[in-house]
Amino acid sequence: MMISPSNNSIPNPKLLKEQINAEFAKQKGTFALAFKNLQTGEEILINERVNFHAASTMKTPVLIEAYKQAAAGKFTITDPILVKNEFNSIVDGSLYSLNAEDDSDSVLYTKIGTKLPVYDLLYLMIIKSSNLATNIIIDLVGAQNVNKTMREMGAKDIQVLRGVEDSKAFQKGLNNTTTAYDQMLIFNEMAMGRIVDKKASDAMINILIDQAFNDKIPAQLPKDVKVAHKTGWIKGINHDAGIVYLPDGRKYVLILLSKELVDDKAGVSAMANVSKMIYDYFIGQ
């Protein structure tokens, strides 16, 4: 299928970068962007090495580690695992629990005490951004192992220190962090089928395509464009990171990170606008 260039197509990367920076400059906050054309290798980078609180973008590295350990035979993706709501703080080992009303997926809390397949928890962790599922999976795979895998992949600035809602760790400034560059790196590897193997990479992509939160990268894109992505948000912070698939088979990686947002809603709109600029530039090539 051929895609006709948009009337809004931007002719060159220098002009595109200027327009993106102008869009970001309308907002009070700090933004980062990493774009990679997976056909040509072209990259467009803005604040790509600046550290951000990862929010729920840390769940993609956790997903990767789960598939890596499953491939190594530590468990299978279909193994049953206990749904629990009791976790240890990384500060002192004390127990803490999550509140259903603070989670973007409250349904899993009705399953506490039962067992579900590992896959079901991975799926909820990504598409619903379930914090409870995330903490259960982190207990299964180990945060240190996630970091080790990130280093092996070359992502030196992704830090997954802990699960979600560890308030003692938060108070001590022990947070999960990321950069746009490292997110671009891991999604590039996934898109190329190089995380574990093509089958595992494709399985992760199929989960990410089902993402329920679509207010940033996909928001202004045509409906036949598929996006395999993971969002993240806490007050003043909004992220989206993933792979954009055009119906003609072409694809690109796009990472959008933000922090210190005074107006979250306006920041999200700016990111959706920038995603459309990138799309218009890409199809105009």
Segment roles from a protein language model:
Residues N12-E23, L140-G142, L185-D215, T231-Q285:
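Structured C-terminal helix/loop/strand segments within mature extracytoplasmic catalytic/sensor domains
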Residues G41, K59-A66, M125, M150, ...:
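Residue-level preference for non-acidic, small/hydrophobic
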Residues N7-H53:
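Beta-lactamase-like hydrolase cores
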Residues T30, T114, V118, S129-F187, ...:
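Mid-domain, small-residue-enriched loop/turn segments at the edges of structured enzyme/sensor domains
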Residues N88-N135:
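Conserved catalytic neighborhood of penicillin-recognizing serine enzymes
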